Amino acid sequence: MTIKSFCSFVSTPSAIRLRFRALAKAITALEKIDESILKQLPELKIIGKYGVGLDMIDLHAMKKYDVQLGWTGGVNKRSVSELVVSSAIALLHRSVFANAEVRKGEWYQVKGRQLSECTVGIIGCGHVGKDLVKLLRPFSCKILVHDILNFEDFYQENDVIA
């Protein structure tokens, strides 16, 4: 078996076809893989997707051309959830504003809010949403999770939306 290693992103369909030509297995990150690519790569049987989003992969075309998918869904859920919690706390406490004022040599009593006083709305409850719920529970905030249809109602009910 021949192993080829490429460490650069290719974005055009012709560059993708050229790079994956005669390969049975390939790992993609941001490359768009659709039917126009797959029909010209008959040797390709497995695509490993680096990262979590599948929006760049045409799953119907993969099935049509009998190409298998290797995917690590949820692999980054903790880092994304932690970023959401830390960003919410920083925004509620107005930390960025306070930091800027201190750097200018000024100090104001910044009145922020505590996460425990808020209602946090989570749009979708996939890998990240479920992990975010786990991280928010110790803050004793009200948590609403919903795969929503009516954004207006959802916006009205929440202080923090993730």
Regions found by a protein language model. Name each.
Residues M1, E31-K32, D147-E152:
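Short, polar loop motifs at secondary-structure junctions
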Residues P13-I16, D34-I37, K111, D159-V160:
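Acidic, amphipathic alpha-helical patches
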Residues E101-Y108:
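A short, charged, Gly/Pro-tolerant segment at domain boundaries
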Residues K25-N99, R113:
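Phosphate/diphosphate ligand-binding glycine-rich loop within oxidoreductases
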Residues A22, E43, D159-A162:
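Glycine-centered tight turns that cap/initiate beta-strands
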Residues S5-S8, K25-T28, I47, K142-D147:
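Short, hydrophobic beta-strand segments that form beta-sheet elements in well-ordered domains
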Residues V110-A162:
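Rossmann-like dinucleotide/phosphate-binding beta-alpha-beta segment
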Residues M1-K25:
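N-terminal glycine-/charge-rich "phosphate-binding" loop or analogous flexible N-terminal tail
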